[in-house]
């Protein structure tokens, strides 16, 4: 898909509560993200979603994968061992 196709699909199906950049991100690695048109960007916005480790850090991916195999989410009504 292209950036424009992703944006058009989003506009048709997602509530828009704030303005957005006209970029559709496909993947990230380290501090860089790539859009669906293959253009690479340096991510200076990680504080918005608290993504301070960058993208696809191997240790983070392994830890999340292991946790998802046990319990990916539960309400804070319950106790769990992180």
What does each model-identified segment do?
Residues 2-3, 32-37, 57-63:
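Short hydrophobic/aromatic-rich motifs at helix boundaries and adjacent loops
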Residues 40-82:
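Glycine-rich loop-to-alpha-helix module at the N-terminal edge of alpha/beta enzyme cores
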Residues 23-43:
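Active-site and channel-lining beta-strand-loop segments
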Residues 1-29, 71:
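Active-site-adjacent loop/helix segments that line or gate small-molecule/cofactor pockets in enzymes
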């Amino acid at each position: 898909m292209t950036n424009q196709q992703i944006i058009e699909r989003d506009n048709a199906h997602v509530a828009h509560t704030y303005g957005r950049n006209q970029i559709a991100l496909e993947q990230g690695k380290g501090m860089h993200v790539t859009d669906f048109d293959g253009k690479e960007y340096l991510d200076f916005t990680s504080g918005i979603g608290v993504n301070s480790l960058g993208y696809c850090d191997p240790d983070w991916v392994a830890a999340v994968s292991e946790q998802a195999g046990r319990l990916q989410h539960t309400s804070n009504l319950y106790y769990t061992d992180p």
